[in-house]
Amino acid sequence: MPIPKAFALLGPTACGKTALALKIAETLPVEIISLDSALVYTGMDIGTAKPSASERAFVPHHLIDIITPVQTYSAARFVEDCTRLIGEITARGKCPLIVGGTMMYFRALTQGLNDLPEADACLRADLDEQKQMYGLDFLYRTLQKVDPETACRLKPNDSQRIERALEVYYLTGKPMSEHLGRQSPHTLPFDLHTAALIPENRARLHENIALRFHLMLEQGFIGEVENLRRRYPGLTADSPAIRCVGYRQAWEYLDGKTDFPAFVEKGIAATRQLAKRQLTWLRKTPLDCVADPFSDGTSCTRLIEAAKRFFGA
């Protein structure tokens, strides 16, 4: 029995991935698997540029609105869910189309997961207490002592990754850098064709990001974040959901830590930094075909034709 096929459409934020995916859906019987760590959360629609109800009615979407903002999702769970969905979609006679820009998830899918321990709620609570008492800098200095290699590649204000690295060390007695260095070879259980939208005109991408951020504000983004604060009292600025680009900046604004113009500036800047990181990942990712979304249009047409050839349409 032939193994399933899946077509991945990658790209930075605000480059037109959703629009191109819908064009592919006009020519192939696809079902879309979201490769976006922000779209998993319910109630976070505007700030994540979540596909509209009409778009989701036009073509089935998966891994959207599957948890609440106080719950957590991981690369390991994505790999499990995505692999299962590829099999289920193929069994229905449809074409799995993976669309998004969360490159950490894509790397886990294609290169495998490291044998790291699951999160430990008690240990994480202890680390949070240490952070509250002594500051994040204390945790970072601790990490520098027990795992200098990981500390060197992390920013001193990256609370989530610093705590995770310490958690791994305390649970296993070995630094995360050692675990990452022992990753075993990985074989995909499906045939994957990887395409990407990579804009040559970065100024155009930056303009798109700013325009989309202002559109989100017009659509009620601040009200959306206010609603999250009311509905989920347990949410904080350090919650994974609120660390999503735009939400952290809105949270700080609503906390009175910044004024509105500064919030907008920071939100746009953070989104541009996200796009830069995504493009850096893409440069290191083996790609079967690439298109410039801001070219004359023939480039994206080639991706559509590539998808058709791959699925034998």
UniProtKB/Swiss-Prot annotation:
EC numbers, comma separated: 2.5.1.75
- SUPFAM superfamilies in the cross-refs: P-loop containing nucleoside triphosphate hydrolases
Q: Please give the Gene Ontology molecular function terms for this protein.
A: ATP binding; tRNA dimethylallyltransferase activity
Site described as Interaction with substrate tRNA, located at T102, R124
Q: What class of enzyme is it?
A: transferase
Interaction with substrate tRNA as annotated region, ranges: 36-39, 160-164, 243-248
Positions bound to ATP: G11, P12, T13, A14, C15, G16, K17, T18
Q: How does it assemble?
A: Monomer.
Q: State the protein's purpose.
A: Catalyzes the transfer of a dimethylallyl group onto the adenine at position 37 in tRNAs that read codons beginning with uridine, leading to the formation of N6-(dimethylallyl)adenosine (i(6)A).
Q: What is this protein called?
A: tRNA dimethylallyltransferase
Record organism: Neisseria meningitidis serogroup C (strain 053442)
Q: Which gene encodes it?
A: miaA
